[in-house]
């Protein structure tokens, strides 16, 4: 992984775990990564990815040579060690299934401060590896800020460490595909009224679903 100017914008703590995540991926879950050229060269953006495994956040984040922000369920902060680590990598706590407006506001503020964020529109890990319906929150955050959204599809993470597995299946390849960024003009529908954020969320999720398996992908 070549050093880039964006690496210098990482805090030392985040940079260490970024490199550690990348190394673990290369050693035990290495598949292929496509589409990293689709990251906007300047300004904030959202990465919206499917979610089938605990492996998804570190693997997706390790492919981006800048400090990203993530969501995590608030209950993880109950552990002092986890709280210390999550705070140091600037993770945003969210109350699952409660429409946590405070967390959404923190994401919007981060984007307005030129920070980029990794989101999982489905809200939680898939129970079977298949895509789930997107929650409207991702649409709200995208529409409120107008930032480009980079769709991401992760293949193989459910087989590597899906819901219900006690230990990872080391050696099972995980492949990541980033699609072209979606401009606000293609996901936002201001005339949709109360359905505006739902429409945006479903359009973003449709772009994730449209990313084919790597052997067929054209990025």
Question: How should each PLM-predicted stretch be described?
Answer:
Residues 37-40, 169:
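A short beta-turn/loop motif at secondary-structure boundaries
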Residues 11-19, 26-27, 39-98, 106:
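Catalytic core of membrane glycerolipid acyltransferases/transacylases, capturing the structured
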């Amino acid at each position: 992984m070549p050093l880039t100017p964006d690496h210098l914008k990482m805090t030392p703590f985040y940079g260490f775990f970024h490199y550690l995540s990348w190394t673990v991926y290369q050693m035990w879950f290495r598949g292929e990564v496509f589409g990293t050229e689709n990251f906007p060269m300047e300004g904030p953006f959202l990465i919206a990815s499917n979610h089938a495994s605990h492996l998804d956040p570190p693997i997706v984040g390790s492919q981006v040579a800048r400090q990203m922000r993530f969501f995590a369920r608030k209950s993880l902060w109950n552990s002092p060690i986890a709280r210390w680590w999550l705070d140091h990598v600037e993770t945003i706590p969210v109350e699952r299934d409660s429409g946590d407006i405070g967390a959404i506001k923190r994401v919007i503020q981060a984007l307005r401060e030129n920070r980029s964020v990794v989101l999982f529109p489905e809200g939680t890990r898939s129970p079977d590896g298949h895509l789930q319906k997107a929650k409207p929150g991702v649409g709200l955050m995208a529409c409120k800020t107008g930032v480009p959204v980079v769709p991401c599809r992760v293949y193989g993470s459910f087989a590597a460490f899906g819901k219900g597995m006690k230990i990872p299946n080391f050696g099972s390849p995980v492949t990541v595909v980033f699609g072209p960024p979606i401009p606000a003009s293609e996901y936002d529908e201001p005339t949709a009224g109360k359905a505006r954020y739902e429409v945006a969320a479903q359009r973003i999720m449709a772009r994730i679903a449209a990313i084919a398996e790597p052997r067929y992908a054209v990025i």
